[in-house]
């Protein structure tokens, strides 16, 4: 980019390259480059060859919390201070949507314009092409494109914007390629005056007509957010670090956040269609053999470990005291059974003012307090579900969601070859094998055997600890003996309130978002939360997993079915439905925690 932009500028022609990228790339380059390289970059910035926008990179934004999102925007602020600029424009590319909870943060950082370019095969949320996105007294002007960026007229003006993108994982164009872009535009728009610009220039043009733009106040959400459920270990560690962040020093925060910022970045490993490139070996016995020996399998698994290193390096940047706290967290999520004694699995019990009973699957089939019912036989709490998805479900999803039927889209959004290993979907729940008690704590031990475990990826052993206290009921779930499985799967834990839930909300980045106020084509069912869910009567905090489906468990990223909160809140513990560059199988032990508190 430096060489091409300089070559075009020094040639004296009308063609220019003003290369714009997320702030992280330039910020990190200047942090690590040699003195000579830093000098070259500084000269390019001052000459107008290189520019950054207000966001560090494209993220699954609702996986973040407010402080991490603000840190990401501070990198642009650091560059602005260094070079005497004021960035007002930002861009997200590929991910189809983001949460409205980020609007106040964008405005607070001085950003006024956001361009969102959607993956060309994905459903575009039903929003105006250009609009004022408003939330909690703040706003950002947004331009939406059905592609990474395309020719777009700015409403009410004679100005248009054209994005000259290269493809995924490609660098900037050559000088001749830039000249060809100019020739093609001049041929198509012979009366136009062409001018290279960055996002700040585009922002100023759009802001000039801001008062004429429609106002939009609905949540959009992220129809790709299911991807972050593919690695429970990474998400669990990430969330715990964000919870402990207020205890860190400022220096610790900067060092750790530099690594943690790349966890919600939307690339989680190598491109599967390129580097795994295997439409066979879905049957588990065949998969287990090839996984041990094939270089392509080992290569993609190594890329997933490399992604986990962001969390490991963030942890290593902390003081011994704070690192020790992270190493200790959650180790007692499910106790080893010491001090517990067996009790009747069919019995009814009372503890700390709660009356309750466990079901044959280990879930709570009764939970009452002070005459109020939270769980019953039809509204279970802590209900575990394992499911595999069928070729028919993928075909239905593909037809409903995908707007472009080409080879790369079928690879990214499908599971080509899975029909050799599964014909129809599977749904399995565990069987309660033992119930133990220690004071106000109960430990349910379950098993999940049969086809789901023998042929697919269902964990064989499960434990749910439920602790009853005056102010709360806490749940801790653990699985062990989970086989890896290439057939796409989803694992859930559901909480279905018996009364309501009226006025339910999902918290994202510190804001309580109404899941019934999501635009068509947006992230309607599945959400990432930084805290949990609430309704008139209660609140459930989720400590270790981010994903929650409002209504029945839905991990497929698009549906036109209405949202039914009365069917409960289903927390997705793990899923492998995505293609692209996410984790394709998972066999680690895992544990998850939730805390329920009444709200009067």
What is the role of each PLM region?
Residues 250, 254, 262-268, 272-479, ...:
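Catalytic and substrate-binding regions of extracellular carbohydrate-active enzymes
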Residues 1-311, 438-600:
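Catalytic-domain carbohydrate-binding cleft regions of carbohydrate-active enzymes
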């Amino acid at each position: 980019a430096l060489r091409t932009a300089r070559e075009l500028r020094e040639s004296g022609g009308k063609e220019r390259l003003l290369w714009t990228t997320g702030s992280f790339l330039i910020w990190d380059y200047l942090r690590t480059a040699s003195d000579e390289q830093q000098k070259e970059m500084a000269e390019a910035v001052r000459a107008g060859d290189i520019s950054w926008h207000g966001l560090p990179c494209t993220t699954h934004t609702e996986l973040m919390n407010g402080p991490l999102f603000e840190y990401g925007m501070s990198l642009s602020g650091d560059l602005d201070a260094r070079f005497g600029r004021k960035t007002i424009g930002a861009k997200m590319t590929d991910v189809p949507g983001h949460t409205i909870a980020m609007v106040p943060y964008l405005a607070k950082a001085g950003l006024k314009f956001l361009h969102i370019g959607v993956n060309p095969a994905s459903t575009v949320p039903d929003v105006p092409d250009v609009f004022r996105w408003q939330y909690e007294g703040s706003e950002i002007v947004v331009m939406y494109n059905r592609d990474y960026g395309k020719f777009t007229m700015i409403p009410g003006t004679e100005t248009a914007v054209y994005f000259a993108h290269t493809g995924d994982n490609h660098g900037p164009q050559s000088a001749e390629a830039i000249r060809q872009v100019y020739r093609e535009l001049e041929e198509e728009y012979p009366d136009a005056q062409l001018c290279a610009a960055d996002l700040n220039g585009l922002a100023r043009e759009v802001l000039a007509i801001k008062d004429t733009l429609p106002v939009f106040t609905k949540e959009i959400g992220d129809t790709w957010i299911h991807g972050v459920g593919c690695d429970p270990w990474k998400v669990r560690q990430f969330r715990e670090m964000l919870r402990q962040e207020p205890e860190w020093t400022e220096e610790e925060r900067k060092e750790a956040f530099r690594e943690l910022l790349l966890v919600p970045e939307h690339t989680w490993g190598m491109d599967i269609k390129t580097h795994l490139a295997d439409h066979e070996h879905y049957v588990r016995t065949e998969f287990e053999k090839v996984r041990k020996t094939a270089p392509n399998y080992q290569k993609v698994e190594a890329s997933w470990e490399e992604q986990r290193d962001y969390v490991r390096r963030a942890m290593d940047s902390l003081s011994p005291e704070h690192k020790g706290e992270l190493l200790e967290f959650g180790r007692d999520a499910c106790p080893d059974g010491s001090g517990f004694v067996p009790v009747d699995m069919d019995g009814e019990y009372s503890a700390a003012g709660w009356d309750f009973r466990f079901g044959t699957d280990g879930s709570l089939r009764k939970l009452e307090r002070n005459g109020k019912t939270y769980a019953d036989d039809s509204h279970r709490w802590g209900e575990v579900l394992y499911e595999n998805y069928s070729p028919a479900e993928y075909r239905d999803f593909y037809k409903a969601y995908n707007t472009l039927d080409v080879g790369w889209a079928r690879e990214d959004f499908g599971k080509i070859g899975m029909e050799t290993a599964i014909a129809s979907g599977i749904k399995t729940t565990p069987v309660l094998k033992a119930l133990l008690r220690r004071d106000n704590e109960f430990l349910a031990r379950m098993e999940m055997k049969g086809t789901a475990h023998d042929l697919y990826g269902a964990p064989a052993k499960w434990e749910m600890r439920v602790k009853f206290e005056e102010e709360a009921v806490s749940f801790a779930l653990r699985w062990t003996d989970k086989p890896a499985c290439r057939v796409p799967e989803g694992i859930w834990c559901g909480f279905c309130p018996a009364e309501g839930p009226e006025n339910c909300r999902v918290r994202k980045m510190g804001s309580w978002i109404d899941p019934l106020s999501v635009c068509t084509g947006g992230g309607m069912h599945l959400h990432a939360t930084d805290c949990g869910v609430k309704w008139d009567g209660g609140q459930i905090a989720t400590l270790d997993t981010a994903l929650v489906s409002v209504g029945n468990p839905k991990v497929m990223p698009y549906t036109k079915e209405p949202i039914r909160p009365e069917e409960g809140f289903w927390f997705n513990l793990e899923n492998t439905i995505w293609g692209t560059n996410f984790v394709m199988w998972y066999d680690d032990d895992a544990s998850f925690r939730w805390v329920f508190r009444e709200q009067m």
